[in-house]
Amino acid sequence: MSEYRAQKELKPKVEDIARELLDEDKLANVLAFLEFLKNNKLTPRWYTSDSWVVKYKNKTVCKIKLNWMPRSSDKGNFWGIYSAHFTRENWFENYDSYITDDGLKAFIWDHINPPHGCSQQGGTVRCKGWPNVTILGKTYKAVCGCHSLVVKNPDGKTLEYAKEFVLVIKTFIADLAVAGQA
């Protein structure tokens, strides 16, 4: 049975797969992030092989992915937090009032993901990115349309900013719901 089929049947928890794949330091960071999510009433749900989606009010907050670096020497010892919030439904235009901390802005700018031919199907590139995107006052030539923000192996301050970003998204989604737009 393929890994995908096995996981689809079992729908494993992030921590169970993380314990199999990650070294001690990266595992500790994943577990800290999962504890943060739990404390904020956010639960990762299995999405696809080694990937979980975190939703709030039925809107995606982020995805957690393990083992997603096939061209890397780190394969099998990788985790990341992925978000598409800077390209979907023009949400990026509305974040200015939510993100005022310069450190958080710098974190976001440092983790914007350029298009790289992801989502290939049968040799056809489905994701060509979004051209000329301005995020929090900084313009990018192009941003990945699948995962506009990618935080690879976060730890320390990077992990703290990732948590802060998740709270911003949750607050934004809650405000949309109150306004009847979610």
List the predicted regions and their residue ranges.
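Terminal, regulation- and interaction-focused segments at domain boundaries
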Residues: 1-36, 40
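Short, conserved beta-strand/beta-arch hydrophobic-aromatic motifs that form part
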Residues: 47-180
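Short secondary-structure junctions
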Residues: 33, 38-48, 109
